[in-house]
Structures are given as C-alpha cells and as structure tokens.
Amino acid sequence: MAGYYSRSAQLARQMRQLLFPRRCPFCRRVLGTLPLCEVCTPRLEELRRGPVMRLDVSRHYLGALDGAAAPYRYEGVVRSAILRAKYEGESWTAVELGVEMTARLFGAEVEMHFAELVPGLIPGAAIGYDCIVPVPATSRRRGYNVPERMAQPLAHALGLPLLPKALCRVRA
C-alpha cells in the first residue's frame, strides 16, 4: 500500500534506532522520541536572537544578499554542535540543526518518523523563494557538506528544490 513502509524496512529502522538512538545535537544525550533535550531547551532560549532574527547588516557582511537570518547566536551549545558537525564527523548533527533552524525561522511543526525528526510542510511559506542554496563548503575532508545537510530539512519543509551546486566556493 502506498505511503507505508514494508515490514522489513520497519524492522531495519527499528534496529537502527535500537543500535543508534537519536541524540540531542547540542549535548549528545539520548532523546528517544523527544524532539529536544529538556536540559538544552533552556540554554537554547538564552541564545535565541529574539522575535526579529534577521542579522544586523551593520555587524555582519552580507555582500549581495538582501538579508539573512539566524535563529541563535553562535555561542555555547549552538557553537559546540556546529563545530562537532564540521570537525567530528557528526553529519546527523547538521541535519538536526537544520530541523531546529526550520522550526525556529519558519514555524515548521516537527514530526517524528521512525526515530527521525522531519519538519512538516509549511503551506505558503515558500512564496517569494525559488530554491534553497546552501553556502558552499568543502566536503573533501569530512565526506559531507555541513551547510547542505543543514539545508535539507528547510528545502523539504518549504517544498523547494535544494541546489547545492548553484554556487561554487572561491578562495580569496
């Protein structure tokens, strides 16, 4: 039947969940089916940028961009999680951060599907956007591109194509 996983696929996902349970991207505690860690949630609230999350152009260089936004300040548990995704091979952390970013910036409802967080579709949120283009980063050393992994949940929630090769990285 369409939309349902086969018995063997369900069993494989359950085994993966048992062997590799979901962890908090910020402190690595086992979460199970909780969307966020009860210990880190208050820490994240302290790092929230407030109701307006657009980056201040007087403090951040945006180049040719019309604007940019970030749900949290780059400090504390947020900084640690990003650095682990970049330098410690935790690609799952980048995806979980992308889900959290999508929920905070666009108000996506986060759902659990077989022990994986998935942001729900956000009707109408993509108006004015054509695609999602992650900032180019090197993936040679780590085997994956952190910004691309973070952008995947956002593209899914907005129903937009993800174009990871639309920009190329240039060293100045």
Label every PLM stretch briefly:
Residues 1-172:
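Glycine-rich phosphate/pyrophosphate-handling loop used in enzymes and phosphotransfer proteins
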